[in-house]
């Protein structure tokens, strides 16, 4: 059973968020070591474990084992939802293959039925969002309802939406301005992945108007990032492509 931070009121611990991984366990293991993960740390993985680099099955094996030893919360990314459909045997389109699915499809050619089922179970158990006792929201992508996550009509928005990040970037209004976006008033802080910060020319986590994006481009030329949300310290892997020198990732 996962015990959340408010259930450990007398223990000093870090709450760490981990950005998009995209089938790169080598980079994840490297950054976990650099962050010097301790037994009492609470790790919130923001999703997109699948698609991109060649080791999605190995990554899911690692995460399944890792949660037995560490306090982890795993959120659902859009690529995880797609990978789940693939493992169920649903027809997958060319667009999925072009955006990292081809590597996943190839990686599962020789994976046993037992492992596939374990991965399916893991992906089925992912959470769409997490709201902590300090009103800090964690989810892969965003939400669209102006009253917040409890009122979202389409749960897919939690792992597909990009408008929250676009609004956070583009808003130059004061929070006291009557036109300040409602979505940015609801939560103390919001932590997301989904849209690489490398699109803005940075391989570091970026924050705008209370929304912090920890997807630092691991699927492309960037890194995997772990951030301590209380101190804002962060650790990064090497550029992921340097750990997979014979692969393209999603650099197509």
Regions found by a protein language model. Name each.
Residues 115-139, 144, 149-199:
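His/acidic metal-ligating clusters that form di-metal
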